[in-house]
Design a protein with these regions (language model features):
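Terminal accessory carbohydrate-recognition/targeting modules of carbohydrate-active enzymes
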Residues: 1-261
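C-terminal capping/lid segments that line or modulate ligand- or cofactor-binding pockets
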Residues: 1-53, 303-306, 356-373, 486-508, ...
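Aromatic-rich carbohydrate-recognition surfaces in CAZymes
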Residues: 125, 302-405, 430, 572-594
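The feature captures the catalytic groove of carbohydrate-active enzymes
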Residues: 212, 216-235, 300, 346-365, ...
Length: 595
């Protein structure tokens, strides 16, 4: 399923509890808030209206500024945006003599990891006389939906009512509604609710703002699986205070930022890394466990589903760069939920099967991911975890079933992205398997390790069976084979021949490798994953520069792009942003690519 990216360049933020993907760049209004609900195996999302992606509906929450009884349209005279650490959107706008600054933060870090959003605003009066100011937050609940890949609207109607301490609670009218939002300010605010099919609400306060004075206001939006839980989280956010929550978040993000020594590259890595970290990984509101999805952003057609390959080879490596504790939890969680049938297809977030289809790379990814995790973190004790050991044994068994009767080569049903190869034996798949076998031989118990196929034999057989042209000076590798004489040269985007050095089949300077990829260098492809693969190819520096300049989907990954790098389909690809973040870091540190 492919979705065209929205025309509005939405600002995006969030934490593991909530995603805030639709912050309007024109006025900083919030049009959608989403959370993961494990029991539903889906995202639950609140919006101002069903056409929220087009920006034509009322906002779920927007700032209210009234000066001397005259409403101010925030952003009417222009609005400037910056993103701290590549993730925290901050804005500033002028309205007459007033300078309005704001930050929208989903708290993260020590004593800040809550299911909520902080909207912090300051209003500075740069005029020569005092003004009567109303500052507040208002919004409309006009749409609620559950989404795996396609959205389904809730039919029970929307409810808004005044809570305790001048707060407002938004929820569904049914007692089974799986999400509630509690909204309140710090300090004294009045609250109003307007009933209706799409109920409206307002929090505001009045004050006099003298010349040269600055007034600060903070609003909290808290979430829970029902109204009482949301109200409790709101109470905690008020108690901890917006300044502490924002400060803790900024500190946590600074500690997580990887460094390459190049400031522009570091900013690019941080942007992709934090997008993957917060929009591919979620903690469900109803059980607080961690889950991984392709993307929590509503304009990505892969939605709240995931393949083992993407979880372990795209998302996990990026997380390891920033948060080794979460990386360990994520690795074990994937093994727990998905390891019962490694590489068996697309999964819902809870591990149940969404779409069957065996991927050789998906099965092999468990061993490679474990080894990469240990190398990155030095946590070799992780192999003692029973759930991880079970997954490794299971992945080995599933790969062995696919082994050719007489040759040490392995077949696959689908490529890593689910596409079907023209021939069942692929060069990419067997290169990945060979690397996995290297890991399994020193990870499994001694008796089982003796039965593990020698990876050198796999690589040797691959080179013999996939090399075409008898003349060594013109030899190259086929991408696929049936091992009976029929081969295919077409490069599969998700199983590109560019990756072969990455999986230690050939050196990136090897003449055979260079001839193999030369035939595909001139091919135009809309698949962004191929641009990623080119980073490890002979012209990695050019690919690095292209990725640095590509606009993508407002700076984040998209599954398909045009030749200039603008998103065409399935933007907001959080898992692929994880791949980009890791590859940019890897290219700088391991390959020495510079821009």
């Amino acid at each position: 399923m492919t979705i065209t990216p929205p025309k509005i360049p939405w600002q995006v933020t969030g934490n593991h509890w909530l995603t805030v993907p639709c912050i309007h760049p024109a006025d900083a209004s919030i049009h959608l808030i989403g959370a993961l609900h494990a029991q539903s195996r889906a995202a639950i999302e609140f919006a101002g209206g069903p056409e929220f992606l087009d920006g034509r509906e009322a906002a779920l929450a927007r700032l209210v500024v009234v000066v001397n009884d005259a409403p101010i349209e925030l952003g009417a005279g222009g609005i400037n945006w910056e993103r701290e650490s590549g993730w925290l959107p901050t804005f500033s706008a002028k309205a007459g003599d007033l300078l309005i600054r704001g930050t929208i933060v989903a708290p993260h870090g020590r004593n800040a990891d809550v299911a909520g959003i902080v909207i912090s605003v300051s209003v500075e009066n740069r005029g020569e006389s005092s003004v009567e100011l109303i500052i507040g937050l208002t919004g409309t609940l006009g749409h609620r939906q559950m989404r795996v890949r396609t959205a389904r609207a809730f039919a029970d109607g929307h409810s808004a009512f005044k809570g305790s301490d001048h707060s407002v609670v938004l929820e569904g009218k049914s007692a089974e509604s799986p999400l509630a939002l509690a909204i309140g300010g710090e300090g004294e605010f009045s609250s109003e609710v307007v009933d209706g099919q799409s109920p409206g609400w307002t929090l505001d306060r009045k004050l006099s703002l003298g010349a040269g004075e600055t007034h600060e206001a903070a609003f909290h939006i808290a979430a829970g699986p029902e109204r009482d839980g949301a109200a409790a989280v709101l109470g905690v956010m008020r108690r901890r205070g917006s300044r502490a929550l924002i400060s803790s978040t900024k500190s946590a993000l600074r500690e997580m930022e990887p460094g390459t020594g190049n400031a522009s590259v570091d900013r690019l890595i941080a942007r992709h890394l934090f997008f993957a970290y917060f929009c591919s990984i979620a903690r469900a509101l109803d059980d607080a466990h961690v889950y991984v999805a392709r993307s929590r952003v509503p304009w990505n057609g892969q939605g709240i589903t995931i393949r083992d390959w993407h979880a372990l080879m795209w998302v996990l490596p990026a997380v390891q760069l920033a948060d080794q504790s979460l990386a360990r939890e994520l690795l074990l969680r994937v093994c727990e939920l998905h390891g019962y049938a490694p590489g068996n297809g697309v999964h819902y977030v809870d591990g149940s099967l969404f779409e069957p289809g065996f991927s050789l790379e998906g099965a092999a990814s468990y061993a490679i991911a474990v080894d990469a995790y240990i190398v990155q973190t030095s946590d070799d004790k992780v192999v003692e975890e029973p759930v991880l050991a079970d997954s490794l044994y299971g992945s080995h068994d599933d790969m062995e079933v696919r082994k050719h009767a007489t040759l040490p080569l392995y077949s696959t049903e689908v490529n890593p992205d689910g596409s079907v190869p023209a021939r069942p034996f692929t060069a990419h798949g067997n290169a990945v398997v060979a690397l996995a076998l290297d890991v399994l031989r020193h990870t499994l118990d001694e008796k089982t390790a003796e039965k593990v196929q020698d990876s050198a034999a796999v690589r040797a057989a691959l080179m013999r069976q996939f090399t075409i042209q008898s003349d060594a000076s013109r030899a190259m590798l086929a991408s696929q084979s049936d091992l009976a004489g029929a081969t295919a040269l077409e490069d599969e985007p998700s199983a590109s021949m560019y990756w072969l050095p990455f999986y230690e089949l050939l050196n990136r300077d090897d003449s055979l490798y260079r001839r193999t990829v030369k035939r595909i260098e001139s091919a135009e492809t809309p698949e962004l994953v191929v641009r990623c693969a080119q980073l490890v190819g002979p012209n990695g520096a050019q690919a690095f520069e292209w990725l640095r300049r590509a606009p993508l989907d407002n700076g984040f990954a998209a599954e398909t792009v045009d030749q200039d790098g603008r998103a065409v389909g399935n933007g907001g690809d959080a898992a692929m942003s994880g791949l980009i973040a890791y590859l940019l870091w890897y290219s700088s540190h391991a390959l020495g690519l510079k821009v």
